[in-house]
């Protein structure tokens, strides 16, 4: 995110207390604790790739739907007590992923934290390279044990609440100058340090980059990759992804990252189906997910669009019907924890994300194939967007189906009649309209519908929120879940 922030939160506990605590943690070798700390993560992490390469599974091979929030600025903004409050809230709302937490926070997104310290003023590094004493000259080969003990504890608190944590080892909005000042060898060494330290935590994955706009510069790309390579040299198990340029990109747009990553993240402020399908169709095949789009309560994009519940809802359903395996939600107040964030944590968008999770978790979402050839939905599709189309203005209808003909799912962002080729289903089907604003179903009269010919479907009016978007669910008779 490229929003400029001020007024860092005041620590609630005296700095001296935290410093003593951090040293005690280090001296008792926190890293020796079991990486599955917390009953919420037992038997789940680390996540891995499914046998067909299309989605994540846990350690029991159960499909893992990414339901992520994005607390990027947590290390620079929150006390441990605040972090636990936040994690507990996210667990209660059905989140299973924190994607992502920056190792250290400084630069354009954190202008009030010039030294990238924790709220109680612990620096991430203890020395500087030649040329200056600001954060861009931190010596990456001199990590501060007290600081990283704090990050250890944050990861363990997340594990306690069943949360997978994507760690950004050195985000690239503010820290590219630091990498340039350190050079390739130090960047690789820093990655090795992180790999050794965090390979013992099961609930970890890695998110490299962050608005990495200069990835086409081979020197910058090599520096960011050096950190990732260093991590992987010590820890080949935990998965990596990378966020490339704003405003639209996919991880695999830079093919040199392909050997390093296992997840293809989509970044877009345009209608999400466009870039999601681009990601889904890239090779090598990887799980695709919505890495970053509009955050709730924040205007972003070019042209800008405000993150209303309707906008983030469209992005969520378009994603899942365009090859997605989940998404990172975001919120203006909780990606950076600006003052007042506690009053903006349980929003309409979070409630509707919980509804989204419940809906797709009731289905074999991992088997959905995007209806790119329009053989399932043959009419009423609306207009395919452009990169300048605002999410709030796009009326494009997305659809997906399971290869065995059990389900066809259609998302309509605006009211219209759609035509479905009923032969896409293996048997006569039960048809329901799902309201994405309150999670209720409305049966389509006259069912079950024969699986022959074409059938038109029209939504039953306004949804509970007073908007026009609905989900059409067609489930073949005998389907296991509906």
What are these regions (language model features)?
Residues 28-36:
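Signal peptide processing junction and immediate N-terminal pro/mature segment
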Residues 453-455:
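Short strand-edge motifs at loop-to-beta-strand transitions and within beta-strands
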Residues 15-29:
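Bacterial N-terminal signal peptides
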Residues 212-213, 246-247, 261, 276-312:
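Active-site clefts of carbohydrate-active enzymes
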Residues 37-57:
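Short acidic, Pro/Gly- and aromatic-enriched capping/linker segments at domain boundaries
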Residues 2-18:
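Bacterial N-terminal signal peptides that target proteins for export
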Residues 37, 296-298, 310-447, 458-482:
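Aromatic- and carboxylate-lined catalytic core of secreted/periplasmic carbohydrate-active enzymes
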Residues 50-263, 267-274:
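Active-site mouth of glycoside hydrolases
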